[in-house]
Amino acid sequence: MSTIPITKRGAELLKEELHRLKHVERPSVINAISEARAQGDLSENAEYDAAKEKQGFIEGRIQELEGKLSAAQIIDPASLDVTGRVVFGATVELEDLEDGTKLIYQIVGDDEADIALNKISISSPIARALISKEEGDVVAVQAPGGNREVEILAVRYV
């Protein structure tokens, strides 16, 4: 299995979710299954069916998280010697050269991406265009509204 790049914070969030699933959700659904079984006939027991379905989801998610964490390559951009260059984990301040809009994005792993928090996936067209570029570079990026030119104003590693 290939490695999955992830920030330290992203790995912490996955570990927190895994802990919650194993120590809160799993015991809760096991209890719900036991209670539904105690009601007798399982062939038409909606509570039992719902609890078993939820159990399947929880177990699947636990396996998925364990797989991701075992393949995770935690990257701390602050520890890299890449001053001024865009790398995984960097926070990049951009200016859209067409309308002057300023944008700030952090480049993160696929599981961490959340545009509402200005976190974009390393596999997104914008991030792929920015990787390895430096402060002051003008970069053509694919955006939903078409190609745009942006200037990299600053690169921070937090």
Can you describe what each PLM-predicted range is?
Residues 1, 16, 37, 43, ...:
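Residue-level signal for pocket-adjacent positions within structured domains
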Residues 75-158:
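Non-DNA-binding regulatory cores of transcription-related proteins
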